[in-house]
């Protein structure tokens, strides 16, 4: 048995898709366990760039099972669109498996997401408006519709009718906007269910059987630890648990079967959406990092906020996710910056603190304590080993590993999978 979890250590967009794709080569099953099509993965495979939002990155390996776990929320319309996108590019999806226990995103979830963000105005969360939050709300309220329900027309119709009574009251009375008729949704979404029916099964059985047979299973997290609903910068978070612990709930695999957790990070920090960001750069260096790193959201197209590497954030991620291995991406983006900074702690009300605060008010008042390091000007995009890197780049990586307390296992010097380099295998026995 060999199981590896890939999690983002920051606010998402760390390059998890690329690392998952890279690690998928040596895995036999690849599974997502939380989130929905609010995630965005950009993957280069055989020289072609693909952008996925819902389907796991391992889909490009037709001999490997690719799982959408029970902890995900699935927009059937978006899924059909993504399947068509892959089919048009001659990518087989016969290896896809979808949990019959995953919850379904319906049009009223999308509408509620949109109007609630508008209502909040300046206090908005910065949601992708994909209906993720409202779908998870229904799940917690025990009125959600699952994939298994979607496949049974009578059950789907009964639950949809019940839900529309409540949702329409909410839309019309509170938000003063038009609701939905059952005929607006029933036939269209039931048909979507029929189109994906061949992929649907009990994915917990698929995953546990694979582990019991000694096969390598890779769990792909979406977003990042700082967007986790429990451990992140609440309320500026997603509605699920991207932390490694989310695997057990969102995939139906017990915690004793998880061996290694790979924390993926950029060599700097980015964030999409609102909320405090202690190391944010609003100067020319920030603009340079954004443009060189092409820091625009895969899902939203929004420019990402950028900042210096924050070891306080990544230490927090290490602790709450049990991270055993660090994968550091986008090192090449920092090339040409004369002096680099790493946040080693925060200064709050005159005191130096080394742990991430729970209070957003406190976080907003924190000032980063920086350690400066000399940069490098050499082209590092062809580096294959640590010794290929210039001395200053190597020292930067070593310092990041020291400050976060996570051994460096993978480093990346460009967007292509060939620019991803392994220092030690994450599939090791111990």
Swiss-Prot record:
Source organism (scientific name): Bacillus velezensis (strain DSM 23117 / BGSC 10A6 / LMG 26770 / FZB42) (Bacillus amyloliquefaciens subsp. plantarum)
InterPro entries cross-referenced by the UniProt entry: Adenylosuccin_syn_GTP-bd, Adenylosuccin_syn_Lys_AS, Adenylosuccinate_synth_dom1, Adenylosuccinate_synth_dom2, Adenylosuccinate_synth_dom3, Adenylosuccinate_synthetase, P-loop_NTPase
Cofactor(s) listed: Mg(2+)
GO biological processes: 'de novo' AMP biosynthetic process; IMP metabolic process
Metabolic or biological pathway, per its Swiss-Prot or TrEMBL entry: Purine metabolism; AMP biosynthesis via de novo pathway; AMP from IMP: step 1/2
Lineage of the organism: Bacteria, Bacillati, Bacillota, Bacilli, Bacillales
Record has Cell cycle as a keyword: no
Gene, per the UniProt record: purA
Cellular compartments per GO CC: cytoplasm
Active site: 13, 41
Group of enzyme by EC: ligase
Subunit structure as annotated in this protein's UniProt entry: Homodimer.
Protein name listed in UniProt: Adenylosuccinate synthetase
């Amino acid at each position: 048995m060999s199981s590896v979890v890939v999690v983002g250590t920051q606010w998402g967009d760390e390059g998890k898709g690329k690392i998952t794709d890279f690690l998928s080569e040596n895995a036999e099953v690849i599974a997502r366990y939380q989130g929905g099509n609010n995630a965005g993965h950009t993957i280069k495979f055989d020289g072609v760039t693909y952008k996925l939002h819902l389907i796991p990155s391992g889909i490009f390996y037709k001999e490997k099972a690719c799982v959408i776990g029970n902890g995900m929320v699935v927009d059937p319309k978006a899924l059909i669109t993504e399947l068509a996108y892959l089919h048009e590019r001659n990518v087989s999806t016969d290896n896809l498996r979808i949990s019959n226990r995953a919850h379904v995103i319906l049009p009223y979830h999308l509408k509620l997401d949109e109007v609630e963000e508008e209502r909040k105005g300046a206090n908005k969360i910065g949601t992708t408006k994909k209906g993720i939050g409202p779908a998870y709300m229904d799940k917690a309220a025990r009125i959600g519709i699952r994939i298994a329900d979607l496949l049974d027309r009578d059950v789907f119709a009964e639950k949809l009718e019940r839900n529309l009574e409540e949702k329409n009251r909410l839309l019309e009375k509170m938000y003063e906007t038009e609701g939905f008729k059952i005929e607006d949704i029933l036939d269209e979404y039931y048909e979507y269910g029929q189109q994906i029916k061949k992929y649907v099964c009990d994915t917990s059985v698929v995953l546990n059987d694979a582990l019991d047979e000694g096969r390598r299973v890779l769990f792909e997290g979406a977003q990042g630890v700082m967007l986790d609903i429990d451990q992140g910068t609440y309320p500026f978070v997603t509605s699920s648990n991207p932390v490694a612990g989310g695997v057990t709930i969102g995939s139906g695999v017990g915690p004793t079967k998880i061996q290694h957790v790979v924390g993926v990070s950029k060599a700097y920090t980015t964030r999409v959406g609102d909320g405090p960001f202690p190391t944010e750069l609003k100067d020319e260096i920030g603009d340079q990092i954004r443009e060189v790193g092409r820091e625009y959201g895969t899902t939203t197209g929004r420019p990402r906020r950028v900042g210096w590497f924050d070891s306080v954030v990544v230490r927090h991620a290490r602790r709450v996710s049990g991270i055993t291995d660090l994968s550091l991406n986008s090192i090449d983006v920092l090339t040409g910056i004369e002096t680099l900074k790493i946040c080693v702690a925060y200064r709050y009300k005159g005191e130096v603190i080394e742990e991430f605060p729970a209070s957003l008010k406190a976080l907003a008042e924190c000032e980063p304590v920086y350690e400066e390091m000399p940069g490098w000007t050499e082209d590092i995009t062809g580096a294959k080993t640590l010794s290929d890197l210039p001395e200053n780049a190597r020292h930067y990586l070593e310092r990041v590993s020291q400050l976060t307390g996570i051994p460096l296992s993978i480093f990346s010097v460009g967007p292509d999978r060939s620019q991803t380099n392994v220092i030690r295998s994450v599939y090791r026995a111990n």
